[in-house]
């Protein structure tokens, strides 16, 4: 890799891959860079809020199912707008899916990481760079309030549930007045 592509690769590794590896317990908090430790705080908060709202389960047995389900959910998530909150939801969703694969011992977590990496590179990175890159993402993560986190989690869940046709999930969200 050279020049600009190397910079992009480093941004994705810093923001996405590092958190996924941390979430899967492949690296410890002490192995995260100072930047990753800062964004980990907001991503952990997103994950906790998401976890309180619904348990996301997957039915994934092969690489093609992962690519299809992952791409469907995140395409729906970003079809009308990209923003830092949705990017946080994307990263947390990616980490959860990778951890599910690791815990299921089906050795497909690398497929999730590669699919998430490629999606971010081709679909999100241009927007991220034009909106301040890592510095602006860090600023967002340091200054987000609970209302923006909850709003983005509700939006993410509505897109996830619509794509995955999880009627019970949608009903749960409606019962909790979340969608």
Swiss-Prot record:
Per the annotation, which location comes first and is thus the protein's main one? host cell
| Keyword set, alphabetical order | Apoptosis, Early protein, Host endoplasmic reticulum, Host mitochondrion, Host-virus interaction, Inhibition of host apoptosis by viral BCL2-like protein, Late protein, Modulation of host cell apoptosis by virus
Gene Ontology terms, MF aspect: BH domain binding
Motif BH1, chain ranges: 76-95
Matches recorded under PROSITE patterns: BCL2_FAMILY, BH1, BH2
Keyword Electron transport recorded: no
* Motif BH2 per UniProt: ranges: 126-141
Signals that turn on the gene = Expressed in the early phase of the viral replicative cycle. Expressed in the late phase of the viral replicative cycle.
In terms of superkingdom, the source organism counts as Viruses
Stored SUPFAM superfamilies:
Bcl-2 inhibitors of programmed cell death
| BP-aspect Gene Ontology terms | regulation of apoptotic process; symbiont-mediated suppression of host apoptosis
Any Gene Ontology CC annotation:
host cell endoplasmic reticulum
Localization of this protein: Host mitochondrion; Host endoplasmic reticulum
- Function field: Suppresses apoptosis in host cell to promote the viral replication. Has the ability to potentially bind to all the members of the proapoptotic Bcl-2 family. Inhibits autophagy by interacting with host Beclin 1 (BECN1).
- Family statement: Belongs to the Bcl-2 family.
Subunit organization: Interacts with host BECN1 (via BH3 homology domain); this interaction allows the virus to inhibit BECN1, and thus autophagy. Interacts with host BID. Interacts with host BAX.
The record's section on PANTHER family has: BCL-2 BCL-2 HOMOLOGY REGION 1-3 DOMAIN-CONTAINING PROTEIN, BCL-2 RELATED
What name does UniProt use for this protein? Apoptosis regulator Bcl-2 homolog
What species does this protein belong to?
African swine fever virus (isolate Tick/Malawi/Lil 20-1/1983)
